[in-house]
Amino acid sequence: MLAMAMRKTRPLTIAMLAAMASLTACGGGGASNTISFNSASCGGTWTLAKPGWHTFELYNANDVGGEIDLIDPRTSGVYAEVDQFGPGTTQTMSLDVGSGRYAFRCLFEDTDPMTGPAVTVPGHVKGFTATVPVTNNELVGPAKEYQVYAAAGLKTLVGQTETLASDLQRGNLTAARRDWLPAHLTYETLGAAYDAFGNFDDEIDGRADALGVSNPQWTGFYRLEYGLWHGQSAAELTPYASKLVADVRSLLATWPTMEIPLIDIGLRTHEILENALEFQLTGHDDYGSGTTLASTLANIQGTRELLSLLHPLLVTRYPGLPGVYTWLNRLQTLLEAEHQPGGTWVPVSQLSASARQGIDAACSQALQELAPIASIAEPRNT
């Protein structure tokens, strides 16, 4: 289950094909420009006399918010952006300007996109490379493919939860403990759709945090995990298993009418593992089975699915993409090393200090490599 309200405010974000640069004032004495934006003028008259580090003080003179992009007007590629640009506020943008043409593009609320005058920087000096924007149309295909992927996962999940419920109806707790994990892992591969699932996600995979483990309103996979590994009887758990089956069936039936926001396709490539680091790799989501490392592996599978769908868009826009796979592979190898003979997993609380440090470091580095994708794959009005 992903935490709610996951999208973080990005008051100043840069989407570049080169290394992601800071958008705060940069040291080294770079030239500074103060530029005002309003509904009639997207930057007005401004100059760039030479290549090098430049700092722009951007002032929103409008009474509405919006977004400002620094673009290559020939390709609409984005050098840098100010997102969530509030009225009456000033933001600082710093970047290494190379030779070429530059213009500001304004996307204010309730107005059509507007591009300001272009400025030419002479010479043959290389600076940051502009990222060609991803459009809504380019994300429709990946979104539809993910819809099919999630539907297949939910169909599998129906059968797995039915098996789990049957185990408990027959009073076979050993079989139920065995069959709980593969069912839960299937759900853990569907992380890009959790927000689209809405209340179904709370019913199927909700944590006990707000309710407490004794509250009868707490249901789903974690409720069953708690009972199966805390000595509760099959008779006690059967109603929860039956409800889980009913919820998964209802979700599958409703899924064709649900939509994943296009922005989520790129956003979730980072957020799935971000939540794994916070909840799985800390042991927070371990209600007794000790299998949060397996859940993290399932989260990696879900992340890889998104990357596969986005690959045609990313391969020409993000030169850091090979590093994403390098660190996902490294993290996966470290996790698989904790899979024990007989199918059990080492609980996070029992990891050696070196193993835990290695896993956390690999996950953090993978997240760093994944981070630019949300901005690169964000659909933009051009």
Residue ranges and their predicted role:
Residues 46-64, 91-106:
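Beta-strand cores of secreted/periplasmic/IMS beta-sandwich domains, seen most often
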Residues 37, 86-128:
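Extracellular/periplasmic metallocenter environments
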Residues 61, 107-111, 133:
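Beta-strand-rich extracellular modules
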Residues 2-14:
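Bacterial N-terminal signal peptides that target proteins for export
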Residues 27-29:
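Bacterial signal peptide processing site
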Residues 31-50:
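N-terminal edge beta-strand
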Residues 128-382:
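Mature extracytoplasmic or organellar-lumen-exposed domains after removal of signal/transit peptides
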Residues 22-25:
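C-terminal motif of bacterial Sec signal peptides marking the signal peptidase cleavage site
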